[in-house]
Amino acid sequence: MADLEEQLSDEEKVRIAAKFIIHAPPGEFNEVFNDVRLLLNNDNLLREGAAHAFAQYNLDQFTPVKIEGYEEQVLITEHGDLGNGKFLDPKNRVSFKFDHLRKEATDPRPCEGENAIESWRHSVETAMRAYVKEHYPNGVCTVYGKTIDGQQTIIACIESHQFQAKNFWNGRWRSEWKFTITPSTTQVVGILKIQVHYYEDGNVQLVSHKDIQESLTVSNEVQTAKEFIKIVEAAENEYQTAISENYQTMSDTTFKALRRQLPVTRTKIDWNKILSYKIGKEMQNA
């Protein structure tokens, strides 16, 4: 092990550490960071060399953050990234600095979004917040209005998590939905992601995602937002139901097939007669 450590350059050590951090399960960033910190044994190297991994983790995980002075949380996503460690809260029209290691928001300042698309963004946000409140009690959503390649685009991100470290499991739901505002009809593109880690007496992870594409009729802002939410609700319900049914099927068939029905002897043990068995006598003599 010492020989291997001597062969690794600082760059290689940081690259390995960064991979561990980026793949940390939901709610376990601090634990993975502390373990990597002990292994690397060089805080300056870790902070400087793996800073991109801290940022990538928060962007990938849709990390929610509370801005002081504002009631609702906002998600850290690539769509709100303003550069230089600053992010956008489109609902409250503020920018803020985000510390990717401490996961803290500071220095909120007024920041105007794209006014030309604000009425569309606001309508979708209102409908989306009502949907999230109904289906994800602990959920957070952030809705952006942006011009991408000359097209006015709405992007809605949802995050909901449950961290149960005392019960040895953590899980997170993420979904991202987008559509461009075009006459008559447009395409809604979505990606749904589930990640769960269970680690009591073992180490099991569920990592699943599904891509969605549906047609959306475009009319006025409010009606289009309602139709958009119908698509989101149907797709997310179907996906979650399918995940549950697959797990039930695996429990009834796959996992059951892995269990040995009988001992190697092909006979069941009569525990009332255990002393008459050779193993029973050996236990008695012991």
UniProtKB/Swiss-Prot annotation:
GO biological process: actin cytoskeleton organization; barbed-end actin filament capping
GO CC, any one term: cortical cytoskeleton
GO function terms (MF aspect): actin filament binding
InterPro entries: CapZ_alpha, CapZ_alpha/beta, CapZ_alpha/beta_2, CapZ_alpha_1, F-actin_cap_asu_CS
Keyword Acetylation: yes
Alphabetic keyword roster: Acetylation, Actin capping, Actin-binding, Phosphoprotein
PROSITE patterns in the record: F_ACTIN_CAPPING_A_1, F_ACTIN_CAPPING_A_2
Modified positions (N-acetylalanine) in chain numbering: 2
Modified residues (Phosphoserine): 9
Pfam families to which the protein is assigned, alphabetical: F-actin_cap_A (PF01267)
Subunit and interaction comment: Component of the F-actin capping complex, composed of a heterodimer of an alpha and a beta subunit. Component of the WASH complex, composed of F-actin-capping protein subunit alpha (CAPZA1, CAPZA2 or CAPZA3), F-actin-capping protein subunit beta (CAPZB), WASHC1, WASHC2, WASHC3, WASHC4 and WASHC5. Interacts with RCSD1/CAPZIP. Directly interacts with CRACD; this interaction decreases binding to actin.
Entry similarity comment: Belongs to the F-actin-capping protein alpha subunit family.
Function: F-actin-capping proteins bind in a Ca(2+)-independent manner to the fast growing ends of actin filaments (barbed end) thereby blocking the exchange of subunits at these ends. Unlike other capping proteins (such as gelsolin and severin), these proteins do not sever actin filaments.
Name by which UniProt lists this protein: F-actin-capping protein subunit alpha-2
Gene: CAPZA2
